[in-house]
Amino acid sequence: MTKESSVKIGLIGAAGRMGKAIQEAASQQDIQLSGGIGRKGAEFGSYNDSESLAKASDVLIDFSTAAALKDNIEAALHHKKPIIIGTTGLTEADHQLIEQAASKIPVILAANTSLGVNMLAALVKQAAAKLGSDWDIEIVEMHHRHKKDAPSGTALLLGRAAAEGRGEKLEDIADLQRCPATEPRETGRIGFASLRGGSVAGDHMVVFASEGERIELGHRAESRIIFARGALKAALWLADQSAGFYQMKDVLGL
């Protein structure tokens, strides 16, 4: 029996776009899903809540909602099961809850689970460190019309990578919106622009602009299946880890 077929993965948020993509990817790779729950309870399997799903699983993947985060983490803690959190739109209190849980169980918080985006983040960090603050940084992202949070979690991931490259905290140098704008762009800031429309799975562009030249580093997701494959890879990896807080760069060795 292979590791892929022996690790039982519980899926929270199974009815959503990512949940359906994970089910498709799991069937393609012969990965075992122990069950899945959605907004109305059981989606497949016989588990109506995260508590019963955690009991029957070796590791959990959560792509549900921020409102359900507390219950999902408590279920993982109760049964001492690793959990991957792909939910976006989290508050500072949510992040504190995740950090506390990571002292007792393995936790991955992933704004984006694709290999390409995480490689992009590594490149952005390196570029920001080498180019310096006299190069302006702007991050542009576009998603489908149904996405609620803006900027996207991935855009913020890329922003943090750029800020870390400069030895800064994103919260101190981010311009999340410029409407209305009455002053010129301030040197050293990182700007964000969010577009919403159609069925776009996820486009991200990081622009480094200086006098007379610019560098554009980008990633385009053509299907959610890339995120699903990354999430499953992370779940199999996390099942073997000790308690702690991890990121996708740890899974991918970046």
Curated annotation (Swiss-Prot):
UniProt-annotated binding residues for (S)-2,3,4,5-tetrahydrodipicolinate: H144, G153, T154
The organism's taxonomy opens as: Bacteria, Pseudomonadati, Pseudomonadota, Alphaproteobacteria, Sphingomonadales
Record's catalysed reaction(s): (S)-2,3,4,5-tetrahydrodipicolinate + NAD(+) + H2O = (2S,4S)-4-hydroxy-2,3,4,5-tetrahydrodipicolinate + NADH + H(+); (S)-2,3,4,5-tetrahydrodipicolinate + NADP(+) + H2O = (2S,4S)-4-hydroxy-2,3,4,5-tetrahydrodipicolinate + NADPH + H(+)
Q: Does the keyword Transmembrane helix apply?
A: no
Organism, as annotated = Zymomonas mobilis subsp. mobilis (strain ATCC 31821 / ZM4 / CP4)
What's this protein's name? 4-hydroxy-tetrahydrodipicolinate reductase
Per the record, its GO cellular-component terms are: cytoplasm
Q: Where does NAD(+) bind?
A: G13, A14, A15, G16, R17, M18, G86, T87, T88, A110, A111, N112, T113
Instruction: Read off the Pfam families from this record.
Output: DapB_C, DapB_N
What keywords are annotated for this sequence in UniProt? Amino-acid biosynthesis, Cytoplasm, Diaminopimelate biosynthesis, Lysine biosynthesis, NAD, NADP, Oxidoreductase
What the record says about family reads: Belongs to the DapB family.
